[in-house]
C-alpha cells in the first residue's frame, strides 16, 4: 500500500516570540520540520506535502525539492490546512499520515507501528495517542469495549469521569486517503473559533460506521509539540538524551552526557571517548578509538580512527588516522590532515592539505597550501596567501623544514628536503635540498649602554 504524508507547518507560532518561522527553530542543530521530514523519508513515505503559510519561502529554502507544498493563505483550522493538500493527494489511493511540523521527537519506528496498527485493524482512521501524567488541555481518548476509539473529547467538554482519562490525542493520525478528502468536504466551522477542525473527520467516519482505531506511543515525551521556548528547550534536552544514549549503547564513552551535544546525523565509532563540552554537529563522522574534547566543536567533518581533537574547532575538514589536533587549534574550509599529523596550539589551517607525519605545533596560519609528508612548520610560520584582492598557493614538498617566524609569500614553492632558516621572509622558490636565508644579518654594538 502507498503511504503519503501531510505535514502541518502553516502556524504563525506567535508564542515563540521570534522572527524565525516556528517550525524552522532548530532542535539538535536541525530545523524541527526537517526532523519530521527525515523520519517520514526513513519510513519510505511516497509523497510528503508540507502545508505552509506566511513563512512559505523560508520553509521551501530549508526543505527544497524533497517535498511538495500547499499554501494555506488563511489559518482556518487543522481541517482546512489538510484540505489544502487535496490538489496534490486527492486522487491517490492509500494511507495518509497527518503530522505536525513542530513534533521533532517523533520517530520513524513509532510512525511505522502506527501504520501497521492501522492496516491490521482495517480502520479508516487511526489516532496516535499517548499517556500523560498531566493531561490538562489535551483531548481525551474514550475507547469502547472493543478497544477502538469511541470518541475524542476535548478537555473543556469532558465530564468528571472523562477528565480522569490519561490517554490523550497527540494530533498525529493515519487516514484512508480517499475517505479523508471526502469527509473534509463535510466538516463545518460552526464552533466558537469559526475554524474547520481535523478531528471532526473522526466524527464523520464514526457516523458512517467506520472503525476508528488508536495506537499508543511508548512515551508521551516523544509526541510533544513545540509551541514556545520552554517546550523548545525540553525537546532539545530530550533529543540530546536520546541521541547520547544511542551512542553509548554502540560503545561510545561519554564522560559527561549532560554537557555533550551530538547532532542527529552524526556517526561515531566504538571505543571513542567524548569529554565534556564536546559538540558534534552536521554530517560529521568520528572513527573508532578517538579522543574528542574537552570543549571541542566539530561540524560537517570526518575524523579517522585513533585521532585526538582537544579544545579545538573543526569545520568542513578531514582529520586522518592517529592525527593530533589542539589544544586551541582551528581547522576550516576543507582542511585535510593525513595520518599521524599534528596541529598544535593556536594553529589555524584553511583550505590546506598536510601529508602524513607533517606538523605545525605552535602559533601558525596555514592557508591555501599543500604540505607534503614529514614537513615541520616551526613556531610562528605563516603562509602569506592574500594580497588584498586574490588568494595564492603555497607548496611545501616532502621532508622540508620551515624554521620559526618564517613568512612564505605566496605563490611560492619550497622543494623536497629544503630548509628555510628562522626569521626569513621567502618570496622566491626554494630548490630541493636548498637552504633559504632571507633576513638581515645581525649587527651587535658592544658597550652601547
Curated annotation (Swiss-Prot):
Annotated cofactor note: Binds 1 Mg(2+) ion per subunit.
Residues given in the record as UDP-N-acetyl-alpha-D-glucosamine binding sites: 8-11, 22, 72, 77-78, 139, 154, 169, 227, 332, 350, 365, 376
Cofactors, names only: Mg(2+)
GO cellular component: cytoplasm; membrane
Region (Linker): 230-250
InterPro entries: Bifunctional_GlmU, GlmU-like, GlmU_C_LbH, Hexapep, Hexapep_transf_CS, NTP_transferase_dom, Nucleotide-diphossugar_trans, Trimer_LpxA-like_sf
EC number: 2.7.7.23, 2.3.1.157
Segments for region (N-acetyltransferase): 251-449
Chain positions recorded as Mg(2+) binding sites: 102, 227
Catalytic reactions on record: alpha-D-glucosamine 1-phosphate + acetyl-CoA = N-acetyl-alpha-D-glucosamine 1-phosphate + CoA + H(+); N-acetyl-alpha-D-glucosamine 1-phosphate + UTP + H(+) = UDP-N-acetyl-alpha-D-glucosamine + diphosphate
Subunit structure, as described in the record: Homotrimer.
Family: In the N-terminal section; belongs to the N-acetylglucosamine-1-phosphate uridyltransferase family.
Protein name: Bifunctional protein GlmU
Organism (species): Exiguobacterium sibiricum (strain DSM 17290 / CCUG 55495 / CIP 109462 / JCM 13490 / 255-15)
Organism phylogeny: Bacteria, Bacillati, Bacillota, Bacilli, Bacillales
Gene transcribed to yield this protein: glmU
